[in-house]
């Protein structure tokens, strides 16, 4: 069977840049699934994406499905015919579904009986006939949150469609996709090359588009070119470009023919905090800032034009004129804000609502101030500095700079606090209070910042859970999952002596009578332990290891982490599997017993050597391990407990627990309970698989 290259290109108006990659990747994944479901043999499915097009190129696509043999078993002969030999309704319905009459059916005889059988040779459908529906289905499944309609058509897509190219080899596949009749016409760059041309063969793509249309259709190629050219441009002026991945992706999605250029701005603007300048360049203008080797911002930026100009200086000057007013605004806001102290913004926080049932930002500030001081006391941080940081924590939200450039919240608080002469750890805390903002983000760097960051997040968790608005499904408007994981990361990775129970209780107490959920403390702790589960799964821990620790519900995050590491290490020991099984057996025995057990094992009642030996070792280990448990040395404790494997195995081999003698039975059950209690001081290892 011969093979050909298939090309589909959907020519559109400008597609959403932040969604371009996901649209193209989904298009490729959907179409690959369609090919596989149809049984069409194919080679590589390559996707292309540019601002005004999505395309797929499939190598070595078979021209038809393979022929296949099908068999459909019908009713058993006993049910297929009545006593007179006439076909039953069931048989006739089955035959009708197969497109035959009952007398045309074959018979299948097996050891279990005889059935009607339809057997047919089905010729594979041509690829040409299948492709239009496969393309339409793949496009319909794209992750488009908001569709649009254009003109008088009822067709909906992410953006208006102007061309549809469907080529199998050199042949146009006739179809109407998204309201457009397929053709071999492709549109080029808006301002360079040929605005429209025809493509003779699918194999010519994407080279013909580059040569005639001045469009680099390969997304990764455009991105790599921008990165390389920007790095070279920065090197020429003695700096390093800030090529953040997200901005690089967005810029690659905005241009069809990237041309990297370098521009500059007045050095006087460098007196403004670099974060505000960078926010303006990256967020508003999609420029790449340039830093000197010492990390200081240079008065230059790199941008990407979508055209090759005969006079690039004109484009450079135009971009410099565009960015200057924005930088001047930042300079003005910075100078204006510094005319008063950060603390002077406190009264204005009373005018901004945090949440209707939970009060204003000033109310939140008061709670954070108190909670940050309480946390500081628990972890040995400077209480006065922590409460001061809490008081100032939201003041920068009322400044002109943050109002205009919202992403500078926190960092501008730090700059204004330094200007006001606040303590350095207070200023840094204002910047780091929102950390970690995302997975893998840096944690607060000093104890005061840790106290403030935890206080801010715990106040939100307690408040939102306290009014019953916990996250549901994928909806999490207050980012509670991120807040919970942030608190856990700070406590664990900074090894802070904090207990979620008392921490949550204190956060809830500070709300007074505002909260309506009577179970708020337990709800918050359960939610945070659930985030622990997700975190440790991401870290590669097995589900049963996590469940074994969660079963003990340890509420000290650092303690939880120590238990996780201990159980993970325990699983590597030779005795682990046997002791996990033994614990499961003990757990089942105790669960089935309704006896009232003793407080201690009665040594005089013990009879068998195996139970005497086990009882003695349990007593010895109980005393030996007490300081281990007190110090959180769970790994050492489990290593010691692993020594119980032989006496435990011997006990179950030689000793009957559920004997008729009640006193002896209760004594043996008590010993097993004491044995299990030792392991439960760390985790429920009976849950290990």
Swiss-Prot record:
Query: What are this entry's molecular-function GO terms?
Result: arginine-tRNA ligase activity; ATP binding; glycine-tRNA ligase activity
Q: What is its EC number?
A: 6.1.1.14
Q: What class of enzyme is it?
A: ligase
Which terms are listed as keywords in the entry? Answer: Aminoacyl-tRNA synthetase, ATP-binding, Cytoplasm, Ligase, Nucleotide-binding, Protein biosynthesis
Which reaction equations make up its catalytic activity?
tRNA(Gly) + glycine + ATP = glycyl-tRNA(Gly) + AMP + diphosphate
Q: Which family does it belong to?
A: Belongs to the class-II aminoacyl-tRNA synthetase family.
Can you state the subunit structure given in the record?
A: Tetramer of two alpha and two beta subunits.
Listed name of the protein: Glycine--tRNA ligase beta subunit
